[in-house]
């Protein structure tokens, strides 16, 4: 079962205009898209996803005249809006970042460290290298960097060395449980979390270019959204959330850091591009009981001035 995290909170905070144009940057299985469509009359929704399974699901289950699904990363939203004369005309954007439940639950996709499957991890299986190929191609230094920066893994170098040594002896790491067991054997079980959690996250982020795609979307988001339009971002780990928070904060108070250092007067209000609608919201107890994966979700919502 796929549950859209923080569904009501995010849709309510978008303050849907029934005649508006909206973008679901991460369609998944359409939970947020369906909720938006239910509030539209003459408005329309454009959804994006890199995953071909999500595209197929949308085409089979979302046959609405005011809905369009685009097989592309959300990093291409600006280009899409430019090509379709939609810059500055979008009433709202929702982004539900990270991996979806169907991707995690399908062992064949290679995202899970508890179900065995090919070590793939690509959200778009039509292109790019698999996680298995990445482990073979990356150096110890690069692999250690990825685990440390993208996974915040304390034992990054130790794990990277063990992986490269294993590959040298065995040729490759082909399955998810093969990698998960190798990580567990390297560092042991030192906490409640599965010891493979951070490295799997890091490898997935690298394979799918997730953080760079997020930065590309946020870099041009002001040109896409109209005045009074809102942006809702749901993140699941500190790296994503930090990027979202810093970008939003920079557009809400562009000279905040400079003011703190130089004691300058507050900036001209014309430099402020956004305002907070929801600075930080987390799942309530009912949602946590229904969906354990919602425990790390953070919702931030802003409005363009």
From Swiss-Prot:
S-adenosyl-L-methionine binds at residues 30-32, 49, 74, 96, 103. It is an enzyme of class 2 (transferase). Coiled coil: none annotated. InterPro entries: RsmH, SAM-dep_MeTrfase_MraW_recog, SAM-dependent_MTases_sf. Its main location: cytoplasm. It is found in: Cytoplasm. It catalyses: cytidine(1402) in 16S rRNA + S-adenosyl-L-methionine = N(4)-methylcytidine(1402) in 16S rRNA + S-adenosyl-L-homocysteine + H(+). The keyword Methyltransferase applies. GO terms for molecular function: rRNA (cytosine-N4-)-methyltransferase activity. It comes from Francisella tularensis subsp. holarctica (strain LVS). One of its GO terms (biological process) is rRNA base methylation. This is Ribosomal RNA small subunit methyltransferase H.
């Amino acid at each position: 079962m796929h549950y859209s995290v923080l569904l009501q909170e995010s849709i309510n905070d978008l303050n849907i205009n029934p005649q508006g144009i909206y973008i679901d940057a991460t369609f998944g299985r359409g939970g947020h898209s369906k909720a938006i469509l239910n509030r539209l009359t003459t408005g329309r929704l454009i959804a994006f996803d890199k995953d071909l399974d999500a595209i197929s699901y949308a085409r089979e289950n979302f046959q609405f005249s005011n809905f369009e699904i685009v097989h592309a990363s959300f990093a291409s939203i600006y280009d899409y809006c430019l090509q379709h004369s939609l810059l500055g005309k979008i009433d709202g954007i929702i982004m539900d970042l990270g991996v979806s439940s169907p991707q995690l639950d399908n062992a064949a996709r290679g995202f899970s460290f508890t179900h065995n499957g090919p070590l793939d991890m690509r959200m778009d299986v039509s292109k790019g290298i698999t996680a298995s190929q990445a482990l073979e191609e990356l150096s110890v230094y690069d692999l250690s960097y990825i685990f440390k920066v993208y996974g915040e893994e304390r034992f990054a170098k130790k794990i990277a060395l063990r992986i490269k040594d294993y590959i040298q002896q065995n040729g490759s790491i082909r399955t998810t449980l093969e990698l998960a067991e190798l990580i567990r054997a390297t560092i042991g079980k030192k906490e409640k979390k599965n010891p493979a959690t951070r490295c799997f996250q890091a490898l997935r982020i690298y394979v799918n270019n997730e953080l760079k795609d997020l930065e590309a979307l946020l870099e041009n988001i002001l040109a896409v959204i109209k005045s009074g339009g809102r942006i809702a971002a749901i993140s699941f780990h500190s790296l994503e959330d930090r990027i979202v928070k810093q970008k939003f904060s920079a557009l809400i108070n562009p000279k905040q850091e400079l003011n703190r250092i130089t004691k300058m007067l507050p900036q001209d209000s014309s430099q402020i591009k956004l305002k907070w609608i929801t600075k930080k919201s987390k799942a309530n107890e009912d949602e946590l009981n229904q969906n354990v994966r919602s425990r790390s979700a953070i919702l931030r919502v802003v409005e363009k001035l």
